[in-house]
Amino acid sequence: HQLTRRQRQMCIRDRYGTFGIHPHEANTNSINKDQIIKNVSKNHKIIGVGETGLDFYYNNSDKVSQINSFEEHILASIELNKPIIIHSRNAEDETFELLNKYKNQNIKILMHCYTGSLELAKKMLDLNSYFSASGIITFKKSADLNNTFNFIPSDKILIETDSPFLAPVPKRGKTNEPSYLKYTLEHMAKIKNISPQEMELITSQNFKKLFKVN
């Protein structure tokens, strides 16, 4: 059946988006700061810039194009005063160097689907960054990552699905979906030695604080 206008409004009331060019697409979708700002400003429901960053694992785009695109996104996020969502793979030093370049310009950073080292986490915390955990933290071979999230303060942690990828244990191998988020949340609660309810409250508050939503 068709939804009423009010029902449609209710469905999207608490839904938000971000705008950016993934590093895989940096070659074929070049974009500058002003274009990013224009697209983000089209809709008040767009609350961040990204996912952007550097991926030197797949190298679907050349490094120069990735770095140029990343820096344009950084500049746009600063001018818009909105968080930038970072994808970083096999590019820890380069990612930090670019972000650190703008540390005195009130840049707001979210390290998306964080799987980086403890050393990078420490440096990113000096930039007042947030870190988002995906289902990867539930995997058997993620002991080091679990230790890293144990070190990261709870008030700097968010939880994500990365759907349709990275379904958490016990749903690993299946197409990921939002309903599986609870497994990642429960695992993070164990890492932090608090209840899932407390973890849910903390991560929700962190999201609202970072993205300035009620």
PLM regions and their residue ranges:
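Divalent metal-binding pocket/active-site signature
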Residues: 23-31, 37-127, 147-148, 152, ...
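Non-cysteine beta-strand/loop elements that form the S-adenosyl-L-methionine
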Residues: 16-19, 47-52, 155-164
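Single conserved hydrophobic/aromatic residue that forms the stacking wall/gate
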Residues: 1-12
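Thr-Gly-centered strand-to-loop micro-motif
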Residues: 86, 111, 132-135, 160-161, ...
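Conserved catalytic/ligand-binding micro-motifs in nucleotide and anionic cofactor chemistry
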Residues: 143
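Mid-to-C-terminal alpha-helical segments outside catalytic/metal-binding sites
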Residues: 179-214
